[in-house]
Amino acid sequence: MNDFNRGYARSIPADRADMSVDAGLRKFMLGVYNKVALGLVVSGALAYATSSVPAVRDLLFVVQGGRLAGVTPLYMVVAFAPLVLMLIAGFAMRNPKPETAGALYWTIVSLIGASLGSVMLRYTGESVAATFFVTATAFGGLSLFGYTTKKDLTGFGSFLMMGVIGLIVASIVSIFLKSPALLFAINVLGVLIFSGLIAYDTQRLKMTYYEMGGDRASMAVATNFGALSLYINFINLFQFLLSFFGGNRE
């Protein structure tokens, strides 16, 4: 996305290896986690609104008998807009201001939240809540691992990003093949890849904190982009887990 995105963090100096005890780092990471948590709250509220308020729901979804029967052209715009925004930001935002980074974060979170109304219409509320709890638990454990491990995870970054590209290609292929086996493999790999990205991005944020040298503006930007990375990882893990734990509406 910019200098704060994947690949910008260099190796950690040996004298900074024990970063888990740094109070400044803990404060920085807490800011990231708080932003992710608030983003999930906003997304949940928007998902509920777009699935439960008829005037809003009908702008995005075609519902028959209380079940999702299709989507509208506006939904397609909302669903793909976050990807477009991230691509534009990746090429255009080299030294963004904190306000710009914050606006980008909340815009993407809002768009994704609105599109998640489809999840509320497709799966039962109980299964969505249970899967969210499983995702939150897994996210906490994986991020804690990335935060505390002394193993350098940098080498996994390229592998994981190649995996994401592979998932996108496989998902497009599955639309035409309609193979249950391929879909199952995609869902399994999706869980594994985004689990790895949660740990990887957490450690990457630690590296970034030390590279910024305490600059407040840089940390504000990094907080927004770091939260965005972890938020997207969470949402993707949640959706892949729903393929296993989600109960379809009757």
UniProtKB/Swiss-Prot annotation:
Tagged with keyword Transmembrane helix: yes
Primary location group: membrane
Subcellular location: Cell membrane
One Pfam family linked to the record: Bax1-I
Family annotation (InterPro entries): Bax_inhibitor_1-related (IPR006214)
Family affiliation: Belongs to the BI1 family.
Designated name of the protein: Uncharacterized protein CC_3663
